[in-house]
Amino acid sequence: MTEGELLQLSKTGDPDITEDDYLAIISAKTAALISAACRIGAILGSLPEEKENALAMFGKKVGMAFQMADDILDYMADEGELGKRLGKDLKEGKITLPLIYLLKKANPREKDEVRKIIQDGFKKSGLMKILRLFKKYNIIKISLMKADHLIANAKAELSLFPDSPAKNALFRIADYSLSRSK
């Protein structure tokens, strides 16, 4: 997790961060923690290595989707409900998946405006401009689709396991990571 934090710090305020950079950051943070927890459960249950690895990959993908959902919530959740200020990541210079997608989809003039907002630091007017562009380019939906795809892949990792209450519980946890509002 420390590696992920350091990588994120090195990319703070960098509008040229790629989707691969972002995925590497979230893989080394929340996803690493959830993956380790799932792997430990398999080890303690004396499961074969194939199932241990499947559970670890399930945890990694759920952790990545959870972080994506958290990053998306930063731009859409009610501040009172979420418990943190709208646009907090932007204010801290964190370039997350929605901004990466916006920088891919926006026209050249809009890209320049977004880069300026990122480089100049947080201003409420900048956040409002970004939120308008998110709406114009359907960025929240596109970002949620990426997270949803990860959840589907995470569930597929558990195909080695027979249907059971435990497997269903893991599926519910995976689904919750996207449906939460806090």
Feature-to-residue mapping (PLM):
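All-alpha prenyltransferase/terpene-synthase fold signal
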Residues: 1-182
